[in-house]
């Protein structure tokens, strides 16, 4: 960058004279500094040399990562789906990895690992895998059944005001609230039905007068004067 100072003359209106001054002009060079270009060239050369010194397995992993992306599985596939991927590749070898990944909705790296693997379970291992799958299925059904029972007990507690046991913890009744005060609050499927236009019926009981006991008649001073 360089600066240039140029004398300037401006016409003064009204008197016909001139007013002197100095005009400052700043100019910027569009060419890059040679030292900056030399520094960038040295950095690129060192990175290239370091890349060449890496072992072959590191270069191979880097190439696979650049081609298929990072190894980040989104969900697990079943044994049958894994076998289907291998069968499709055997019958249609022209099918690309990215096409299989889009069909099964997983990453291309997962497809590459499945096709590269040659492990085949034996008969005993298949039986063990089958039993483990059945056990997990039974445990899931029991867990869902217990959860539905807890929801039903909570619904009854809110409806009838009774203490129930949920997950081994005894939950006491809440203030003696009666079932008629919470009618139609819960539906048959356990969901809450809340009506904002009729919410006063559950809380302050608007529209109902307070019951009071009638007192016996007693003569006062006005009756005696009359």
Curated annotation (Swiss-Prot):
Keyword terms: Mitochondrion, Transit peptide
Transit peptide start-stop: 1-25
Disulfide-linked positions: none
Protein name stated in the entry: Required for respiratory growth protein 9, mitochondrial
One Gene Ontology CC term in the entry: nucleus
Family statement drawn from the similarity comment of this UniProt entry: Belongs to the RRG9 family.
Major place of residence: mitochondrion
Record InterPro entries: NGRN/Rrg9 (IPR010487)
The keyword Transport appears for this protein: no
Biological source species: Debaryomyces hansenii (strain ATCC 36239 / CBS 767 / BCRC 21394 / JCM 1990 / NBRC 0083 / IGC 2968) (Yeast)
Entry annotated with the keyword Membrane: no
Subcellular location: Mitochondrion
Function of the molecule: Required for respiratory activity and maintenance and expression of the mitochondrial genome.
